[in-house]
């Protein structure tokens, strides 16, 4: 057993990154890693239960983004809103969603705009129903309130800005 009190134990995936100052960031990063993987698994299982088992997490997120506010979106809009640098992955996902008839596209001048098809809208609604049944109904307000969830979302968005700036700095090295 260890002599370190439970409150002082470092829960990290890379001990070499958790030594010295800033070790708490390594603990947060480990939480992000397992959270990202759990979220990816969740969205694919939720979408499968909604009736579409063949979509990747990115394709699911893009479908929901295009469906958001019933507004046509361009490739650049989707990439920007989801903070995806590699637009080729977004373009590939859009083609797959078009082939599955979950999206429709319309060329306007040099730009292509995407919107959710009636089948895509129905799938997003089925996903929402599964999400409500399996995820929301299992989340107790005692575990995390709506205000706490909003604050966590705000902190994650702020942290993403910090990581974006750090990635730009690293690219200059």
Model-derived features with residue positions:
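C-terminal regulatory/oligomerization modules of transcriptional regulators
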Residues: 1-21, 144-173
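N-terminal leader segment of winged-helix/HTH proteins
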Residues: 1-53
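Pre-recognition alpha-helix immediately N-terminal to the DNA-recognition helix
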Residues: 31, 61-64, 122
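Short, locally clustered residues in the helix-turn-helix/winged-helix DNA-binding domain
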Residues: 37, 64-68, 128
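N-terminal helix-turn-helix DNA-binding core of bacterial DNA-binding proteins
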Residues: 44-85
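Basic amphipathic alpha-helical segments that dock to polyanions
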Residues: 63, 78, 93-100
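Helix-turn-helix DNA-binding helix
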Residues: 89-90
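Charged, amphipathic alpha-helical coiled-coil/dimerization segments
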Residues: 95-149
